[in-house]
């Protein structure tokens, strides 16, 4: 009997140790560097010209359908002002933000596709919250630098051509252990380089600590690190396998960092920027063009959650659906299964955070110019389903509402905020246009409009101006 008891205790000890290992923060290596003054502008190396042959001009280009082919327009309820001068709330949710808890920052994170990667939606949310620019900190940056369609809150990024992107949503083995943004950048080519000017603009200060996030493997990796144009410092990354951090420490703000791969294979997983000043509001935006929610399904959750052990979020948002709806044929049952499992994994990583699922906007269909020409001559409408993607996006929005309710989250639909199915055609006709010419994406003005709609539908209110710099935020709505 005693042997059985000892065996049980021993097994419990092993399980406890395993749990501690799983929940341990990433391994940390520190490198003291010397920040410099009077450094030169960061200039990226010119890319080699594309070898693709020039494409012939399309004799029958795609364009907007003629106006009389479009569905009946539906408008959202008119916005009115309250006695306080704030936009009237259309949603029934309680206000999500209230000043409280001095000394504790409010942290928000949002994962998404190209709609988030552009950065305009999140920037407008910060503006609507009335948070001063110097009180907002984007401290976690995903490994998406250099990717077309990505805007980051740093001045410049330079990526040499040897780096390969490993987005998690593709489900490949090399991306199952991702960085915080559910993606990696990989190179095993000597002299591959990454460089950043981490300042927000030329007049802004840098950061006293710059953390390079990476995956430590069993093989050592040799790097050379340069700060603010100074001499390279050799670094050998070697340690326990798993998520790891190389922290650059300086006595004054760091503005520029250059990383060169000397030998080995590096899986870069993001940047963390830190300064000694407390920031009352932190919003981390993890957007990647082409992404789907499947990145949350395929990720090794035990690996992923270690990035956030010391970074609890009060609010987590997932903005996906546009790329899922582009699949042909679209399988709603398969989408529901993927979404359900992905949201379950997200809730495993952030069990106490308020969560919001954001469904895609309306999407239109372009037609060949010849179709519009023939229609004008024949006087009858062509047999083209202009509501094909609008209908799919409506199904995705409905599914997200159902899955959100099951998971204890909130759901919000860009398409509903636009006025429903078919509104992409009319958003494209706004002045300035709110819809991009592809009828899939939005213009900067369109993203800002969506952010304003989201802000009002959530029942959020701006922070009081006099105390915005000192006031910290919390979620006033119950944890769902």
Regions found by a protein language model. Give the residues of each.
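Conserved catalytic region of serine esterases and O-acyltransferases that act on ester linkages
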Residues: 21-67, 71-80, 85-86, 138-243, ...
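Alpha-helical scaffolding within the catalytic cores
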Residues: 87-100, 296-308, 340-345, 366, ...
